[in-house]
Regions:
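Amphipathic alpha-helical interaction surfaces in cytosolic regulatory modules
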Residues: 33-107
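STAS-typified acidic loop motif
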Residues: 2-41, 60
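Short acidic-hydrophobic, aromatic-tinged amphipathic segments that line or gate anion-handling sites
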Residues: 106-116
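Short, solvent-exposed coil/turn elements at secondary-structure transition points
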Residues: 30, 91, 113-115
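A short, structure-level motif marking secondary-structure boundaries and short turns
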Residues: 27-29, 79-80, 123
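A short, charged, amphipathic alpha-helix used as a generic interaction element across diverse proteins
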Residues: 116, 120-124
Length: 125
């Protein structure tokens, strides 16, 4: 399922794709204070479906503001203990900020979606 969030000059497109009990939320565009609340609502809806693994793919994200980082922390905190969050982030727009603020210490980061899917147990992905 694809969701498009447009708030003023900011635009974000998120797709939700399920692989058994694993969900991939792929984001393309700007994650800022205008679009992050919409992305947060999508994440909350997805968490209500009780996935065992949540992969947030930021590969095509062109801007990733601090509110996006806060959303990742909130998502990590909302997950049940037996669920896993994997963030796909690579490069100066996404991965570097996560490393600079120390979030890479407790978030599972992968450089590609394929790498993230390799972390999913076969029965779940």
């Amino acid at each position: 399922m694809t969701y498009q969030f447009v708030s003023g000059p900011s635009s974000l497109v998120c797709t939700e794709t399920w692989h058994a009990t694993t969900v991939v939320i792929s984001c393309s565009g700007v994650v800022d204070m205008l679009t992050a609340p919409h992305m947060g609502q999508l994440v909350t809806t997805v968490l209500g479906k009780r996935p065992s693994v949540v992969i947030i793919d930021l590969t095509d994200t062109s801007m990733f503001a601090s509110c996006g980082m806060s959303l990742l922390v909130e998502t990590h905190e909302k997950l049940p203990e037996d669920a896993k969050l994997i963030v796909v982030a690579d490069g100066p727009v996404t991965r570097r900020p996560l490393e600079l603020v120390g979030l890479s210490a407790f978030l599972t980061l992968r450089s590609t979606l394929d790498e993230a899917l390799e972390d999913v147990p076969l029965a779940e992905g």
